[in-house]
Every structure is written in structure tokens, then in C-alpha cells.
């Protein structure tokens, strides 16, 4: 009956994710197959954090927080976190040091915006002004505006902006400027990589294009203050057998509540 006879379900999933990563690292596979496996890993981790991690947190906070393998759920969460950080670090290293250079050698260039020549930079700026800038909205957090809703899985740019206060307010508060957080959600209908005009297969990441033009969205902002972030929300649903007849209603409730699920990553 010893715990050593069992593998913990969530740690087993983490081990499976490692196998997916290893396929992406396998240089004997075709290049696009390797890239696909790296993408599958990201998708698997999203689902894991939306479904499994919220349940682990619930069990960690329950009075009986030891599983049949003899581990506390707090220990499991810590080990999951350690493994996921290791996986994503290795995934990023594989992508940047192997996949992207190999794509470039085959004529598909995912370039850094700073490496473009003047003509290419101008074309990307025009693309921003016509296709990207008009659909972006900067949402500030201040005493009159709560933290904005961040969609599950969306890409966002966050930054702190310093703004001069009116003279009367500055005198009352004893400070000349105020710092506040600004969030910009990148709409999912925009391309993840922006095509460079004049080159058939050259692209730059959309976040680089936005941050290079950040002052056009938030005039007091600086490119160096921008950080890309992404939220993964709790999307798990629990159905008990006795509720099966109310499945449709339960699903409707879950879909409505899911938009505001707790932040898991």
C-alpha cells in the first residue's frame, strides 16, 4: 500500500509534457514538426493551468491535504511549478537557438525589429498606423478606474506611466507627478507576427511593433517600460452525477462565470 507504487496524476502529466518537449528538441524530425510540438506543449500547459492547477489549489486549502501518494498538495504544486518553469525555459531556448535560426536558413525570417533597415522599419511603422494602432486601447488603473478585465489567453502589454499632476492637486498631495499602471490588450484578430513589406517571408513579433510605437497610444509611455504578459484563467467545471439532468444549465452558468475565473498563471 506504499505511495511509491503510484505516480501522482499531475506529476505524470508534467512528465508527459516533457516528452512532448523532447519531440520538439529532436533534430531528426522535420523542422515544422518540431515547431508543431513546441506549440502543442504550450497548448497542453494552458489546459493544465486552466483545469488541473485550480483543483490542486482547492485540495491544498482543504483540511485533508495529503494524497494517497503521501505528498501534500502544497508539495505537488511546488513541484509542478518547478517542472513547468524548467519546461518553458527549455522550450524558449529550443525556439530561439534552434528553430528560428533553422527557419531563417530556409528563407523564413522571424526578425528583431531593431535589425530592420530604414526602409523595412518605415513599412512596419505604416502597418502599425493603418492596421494595429486604430484597434488598440490603453486602459489605465487609477482611483477612478479599477484593474481592467484581461481575457483568458490574451496577449497584453503592461507598463507604468508617469503623468504630471495639475498644479493644485500637486500642491495638495505634495508630489508633482503620479505613476499608474496601463494595460493594452492585443486583439486576437491581429497577426501574431507582422509581415515586413518587400520581403516574402520576413516577419517581426507584433509586441515589438506596438512597444516601438507606444508613445502614439500612451503619450507619456516609454518603450523600455513595456512588458508582455498573458493570463491563464480557471476554466474547470465540476459536475456531480446527481446534476447530470441539469447539464445544460450548469454549462451555461460555467461559461458565464468562466470569463471571470481566477488567474492561474
What are these model-predicted stretches?
Residues 1-265:
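N-terminal non-catalytic structural scaffold regions of very large proteins
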Amino acid at each position: 500500500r506504499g505511495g511509491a507504487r503510484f505516480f501522482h496524476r499531475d506529476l505524470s502529466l508534467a512528465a508527459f509534457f516533457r516528452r512532448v518537449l523532447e519531440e520538439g528538441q529532436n533534430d531528426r524530425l522535420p523542422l515544422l514538426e518540431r515547431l508543431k510540438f513546441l506549440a502543442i506543449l504550450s497548448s497542453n500547459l494552458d489546459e493544465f493551468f486552466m483545469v488541473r492547477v485550480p483543483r490542486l489549489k482547492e485540495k491544498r486549502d482543504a483540511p485533508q491535504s495529503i494524497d494517497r501518494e503521501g505528498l501534500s498538495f502544497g508539495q505537488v504544486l511546488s513541484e509542478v511549478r518547478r517542472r513547468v518553469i524548467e519546461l518553458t525555459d527549455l522550450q524558449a531556448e529550443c525556439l530561439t537557438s534552434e528553430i528560428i535560426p533553422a527557419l531563417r536558413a530556409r528563407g523564413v525570417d522571424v526578425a528583431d525589429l531593431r535589425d530592420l533597415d530604414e526602409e523595412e522599419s518605415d513599412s512596419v511603422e505604416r502597418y502599425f498606423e493603418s492596421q494595429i494602432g486604430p484597434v488598440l486601447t490603453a486602459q489605465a488603473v487609477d482611483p477612478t478606474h479599477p484593474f481592467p478585465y484581461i481575457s483568458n489567453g490574451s496577449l497584453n502589454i503592461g507598463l507604468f506611466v508617469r503623468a504630471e499632476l495639475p498644479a493644485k492637486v500637486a500642491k495638495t498631495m505634495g508630489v508633482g507627478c503620479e505613476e499608474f499602471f496601463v494595460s493594452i490588450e492585443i486583439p486576437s484578430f491581429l497577426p501574431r507576427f507582422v509581415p515586413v513589406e518587400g520581403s516574402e517571408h520576413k516577419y517581426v513579433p507584433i509586441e515589438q511593433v506596438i512597444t516601438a510605437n507606444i508613445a502614439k497610444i500612451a503619450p507619456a509611455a516609454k518603450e523600455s517600460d513595456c512588458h508582455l504578459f498573458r493570463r491563464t484563467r480557471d476554466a474547470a467545471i465540476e459536475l456531480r452525477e446527481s446534476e447530470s439532468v441539469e447539464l445544460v444549465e450548469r454549462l451555461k452558468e460555467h461559461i458565464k462565470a468562466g470569463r471571470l475565473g481566477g488567474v492561474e498563471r
